[in-house]
UniProtKB/Swiss-Prot annotation:
Domain of life: Bacteria
Any Pfam family: UPF0231
Source lineage: Bacteria, Pseudomonadati, Pseudomonadota, Gammaproteobacteria, Enterobacterales
UniProt cross-references to InterPro entries, sorted A to Z: UPF0231
Similarity comment: Belongs to the UPF0231 family.
Gene name linked to the record: yacL
HAMAP family, sorted: UPF0231 (MF_01053)
Protein name: UPF0231 protein YacL
Amino acid sequence: MDYEFLRDITGVVKVRMSMGHEVVGHWFNEEVKENLALLDEVEQAAHALKGSERSWQRAGHEYTLWMDGEEVMVRANQLEFAGDEMEEGMNYYDEESLSLCGVEDFLQVVAAYRNFVQQK
């Protein structure tokens, strides 16, 4: 999972992720927006879940972050519809709407993001 952090002309941090993980970048850009307290909450949840069967989720305005002890899923909230609403043969998976990654990989991105934000 490759990533890049940039600052736009106004100094706002933007995250770009590799193909297949774009939604993780959107989550940082739309939900985190340099809110380090949210990252603290996510890290605490990840540590609490380690080795357990439990899961945790944080719904945001545009994206929901879900995780268990091994995996993180970020999905666009617009994907919340019942299966019978989908046309037969249609798959709602879209690289721009859903992404999965391991907890350890995700926490590495969180730590790198935090370091980048604090370099102002």
